[in-house]
Amino acid sequence: MDRFLQGRTALVTGSTSGIGLAIAQALASAGARVAINGLGSAEQIEAALKSVTDAGSESQHFDADLRKPDQIAHMLEAVQAWGNIDILVNCAGIQHAAPLAEQPPQKWDDIIAINLSAAFHTMQQALPGMAERGYGRVVNIASVHGLVASQNKAPYVASKFGIVGLSKVAALEYAAAGSRDSGGVTVNCVCPGWVETPLIEPQIQAHRNGGSRDDGVRALLEEKQPSLRMSLPEDIGAMVVWLCRREAHNLTGAAMPMDGGWTAQ
């Protein structure tokens, strides 16, 4: 891979597994030093770090409970001491499926805190430095549910619509920062549909109807994703890396679906 991000530092939240880890690996392959953040045992975190360094760059884990603004602030300070944050990817996310009337209030609070408020706090600290240096990329991993709604996902949908709106505001505020030569500062959302990760396994099982796992996958896709294909985490990683290119300097404020036609219906 073209190591065009050599000398850049990236922070990817929620990057010890799944989509976030694939993004961290892709950025490392492109030459960026990558700060990872996320949950897991010491062994899992060590394995994630090794996979990122094996992809071609230096990596370090920075811990923080993303429900707590003070811990987020301390994490950003530690990452900035390690290297200026040139690329910020907010990927951490949780969900809880239940009818609106049955959603536990604590689930609402946690989902909004991790999926939306944490991104606000990281962006608020990282964007001014990006603007000063003339280059910066914020990529918020939203969801197709930041563009359309589904039943039984009120907190998740609210958080993802919120992060799309937050990203548009930040994109407008920083649109004139930097130049084409420096790369500019952009803020965008990637909005995946179904992606092959452990997060969707309960929904696959719920669609099996006594059949195989493959039957469950097909039923899940037939319901909403016309391509009948799952995205893979590395597909999302490739999109994030492309958004970091200088040629993407004028692509900002976008919410880009990677959903196999879900939102085209």
Regions found by a protein language model. Give the residues of each.
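Conserved glycine-rich cofactor-binding loop
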Residues: 9, 16-17
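Conserved mid-core segment of classical short-chain dehydrogenase/reductases
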Residues: 73, 93-109, 128, 132, ...
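Substrate-binding pocket helix/loop in short-chain dehydrogenase/reductase
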Residues: 99-100, 104-112, 138, 217, ...
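C-terminal substrate-recognition "lid" of short-chain dehydrogenase/reductases
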Residues: 120-123, 127, 131, 135, ...
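Active-site helix of classical SDR
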Residues: 123, 159, 167
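Residue(s) in the substrate-gating loop at a strand-loop-helix junction
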Residues: 143
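Short, small/polar-rich loop/turn modules that mediate ligand/substrate recognition or access, typified
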Residues: 175, 179-181, 186, 251-253
